[in-house]
Amino acid sequence: MEINKFLAVVVAVVVLYSVEATAQGGNPQLTACLQKLLPCQPYIHSLNPPPPPSCCGPMKEIVEKDAPCLCIAFNNPEVLKALNLTKENALLLPKACGVNPDVSLCSKIATPSPIASPGSTNGTSSASTISFNRFSFLSAFVAMIFF
């Protein structure tokens, strides 16, 4: 059982670093969106067992109230590649949660280009933000797995 927890942590860290590297392109909306969907991480590639309410609740909320959030990830080939997903595979998880996102909205919603952070004289501002984001992702996954 302990080896399963260890493997889950390793997989989570690899996925987080992959997604974080993509999100570091400067899109804070994408980072916030992906944080809401952290409970869905174990179900990205396997829907057996079906995703629990802890995954489906945030998924339904995002589909119903924040379509641009999903569109940012759905329209970003780098995010899909980092998660080893195709657009078709990405739609399986919401469907497993009983929601059908209207992906036609994604073609109408302009996904924001990466937002450049304001320049700083010594450059430390951006680095500390990136470190904090990576730490918050990792902390959330570790807490989710062990508690």
From Swiss-Prot:
Membrane-topology annotation of the record: Lipid-anchor; GPI-anchor
Tissue: Expressed in ovules.
Keyword flag Disulfide bond: yes
SMART domains: AAI
Record's GO cellular component terms: plasma membrane; side of membrane
Residues of the signal peptide: 1-23
Gene3D superfamilies, per the entry: Plant lipid-transfer and hydrophobic proteins (1.10.110.10)
Record protein name field: Non-specific lipid transfer protein GPI-anchored 9
Organism listed in the record: Arabidopsis thaliana (Mouse-ear cress)
